[in-house]
Each structure stands twice: as structure tokens, then as C-alpha cells.
Curated annotation (Swiss-Prot):
Protein name: Thiopurine S-methyltransferase
Catalytic activity from the UniProt record: S-adenosyl-L-methionine + a thiopurine = S-adenosyl-L-homocysteine + a thiopurine S-methylether
Taxonomic lineage from the root: Bacteria, Pseudomonadati, Pseudomonadota, Gammaproteobacteria, Vibrionales
Organism for this UniProt entry: Vibrio campbellii (strain ATCC BAA-1116)
A Pfam family it matches: TPMT
Entry keywords, A to Z: Cytoplasm, Methyltransferase, S-adenosyl-L-methionine, Transferase
Family: Belongs to the class I-like SAM-binding methyltransferase superfamily. TPMT family.
Gene3D superfamilies: Vaccinia Virus protein VP39 (3.40.50.150)
Location in the cell: Cytoplasm
Record keyword Acetylation present: no
Length: 216
């Protein structure tokens, strides 16, 4: 994955403003729309050390994550006092396993993850520059089982007013990336003038949006 050094440096210097200390409230609010079953396999690309993994593992028997940063993966297990089984995989990745959770370290585009019934993307697509997003979407579609669903959280703001990441990914681009899939907007949270992205960054508008993407 390109820009690897950028993300390695972020974790190494603990510049992880994108990390949430709690479960993202949008996950429990909208997960039901994926029609989840306990036996559904869930994949979380570019998962970091997200608390969302813990929440998902209470709902599903198999939750997979992929994370470039070894620092993030080790921190995730250490902070929860989990002792994972660590297995080297093909010289490029390591697999960390504990109960329902399996996290691959390394490049998402080459990680040997299993296909999933549901993919949860809160911070992956918006972390990638525009020139990488088509490749990412193709990889996601490749990893989705027939009848699979994606719960996508994205951002929408004038890209020329702020350099990412996180980047703006408007609905038009989502529909283009997932052409042939059913794309449903579940929620648009439009920021007011007190939101830090508007108050501090000076953006003219900023919204966090939730989409359900279904294979037809």
C-alpha cells in the first residue's frame, strides 16, 4: 500500500487523532441495517486499534481486521489485556488471534484474509487519496461474499478547503466506486458552526455520512 511511511510515522509518534477511545456511536446505531447474523464473518479494513472490533466481537463469531501498523495491533491487544496467538504468514504478514478476533498486520491489498459477509469501513476509504480509492474498492468487492453488505462511514466537505487525510468522499464517488451495487444513504450528520472542522479549520460545510452498500 502506498503512503505506508506516512501511517507508520503517525503511529510511531502517537499522532492518532483519528483514533476514538470508545466505540463509534454510528456502529451500534446503524449495524442493524446490515441484517447481521452471529455466524456472519465481519472484516474491518485498516482497523487500527479500534474499540469497534470489541463491539463487533460480541455480536459475531468471527471478526477479521487488517492493520498496517504493528504498533497499533500490539497496542490493541495490550490495552485489553489479551494475549494473542501470533503466526507469521508468507513472510509479509503476521496473524494475531484471540477468541473471535483475527488481525493481520501489513498491507491490506496483500493480506490473506478470508472473504466476509459484512465489511465495516469507518476510517479506511477516507484515509486514502483519490488515486488509491478505486483500487481499494476493487479489493473490498473481491473480499465480499455473494449477498454481502458494507457499512461505510464517510466524510463530505469541499476538498479544496482542507487537505486530507481524512479525505472527502461524496456520494457521487461512492456510487461510481460501487457501480452495480445498491448504495443507500442511511444518515447525514451535518456539522454546525461549533464543530471543530468548521470552527477551527474554517470549512464552509462538513458532514459525516453513513451508507449501506449491498451486492445485488
Amino acid at each position: 500500500m502506498r503512503d505506508q511511511e506516512f501511517w507508520h510515522n503517525k503511529w510511531a509518534s502517537n499522532q492518532i487523532g483519528f483514533h476514538l477511545d470508545d466505540v463509534n456511536p454510528l456502529l451500534p446505531a446503524f449495524w442493524q441495517y446490515t441484517n447481521p447474523k452471529r455466524e456472519d464473518t465481519v472484516l474491518v479494513p485498516l482497523c487500527g486499534k479500534s474499540e469497534d472490533l470489541i463491539w463487533l466481537a460480541t455480536k459475531h463469531d468471527e471478526v477479521q481486521g487488517v492493520e498496517l501498523s504493528l504498533i497499533a495491533v500490539r497496542a490493541f491487544f495490550a490495552e485489553h489485556f489479551y494475549t494473542p496467538t501470533v503466526t507469521p504468514v508468507n513472510g509479509m504478514h503476521e496473524l494475531y488471534q484471540f477468541d473471535e478476533l483475527s488481525i493481520y498486520t501489513g498491507d491490506f491489498f496483500t493480506a490473506p484474509v478470508s472473504k466476509a459477509d459484512i465489511i465495516y469501513d469507518r476510517a479506511a476509504l477516507v484515509a486514502l487519496p483519490k488515486e488509491m480509492r478505486e483500487e481499494y474498492a476493487n479489493r473490498v468487492k473481491q473480499l465480499l461474499n455473494p449477498g454481502g453488505r458494507i457499512l461505510l462511514v464517510t466524510l463530505n466537505y469541499p476538498q479544496d478547503e482542507m487537505s486530507g487525510p481524512p479525505f472527502s468522499v461524496p456520494v457521487e464517488e461512492i456510487e461510481q466506486l460501487f457501480e452495480g451495487y445498491k448504495v443507500t444513504c442511511l444518515n447525514v450528520d451535518q456539522a454546525d458552526e461549533n464543530h471543530p472542522k468548521i470552527a477551527k479549520k474554517g470549512l464552509s460545510r462538513f458532514s459525516e455520512e453513513v451508507y449501506l452498500i449491498e451486492s445485488k
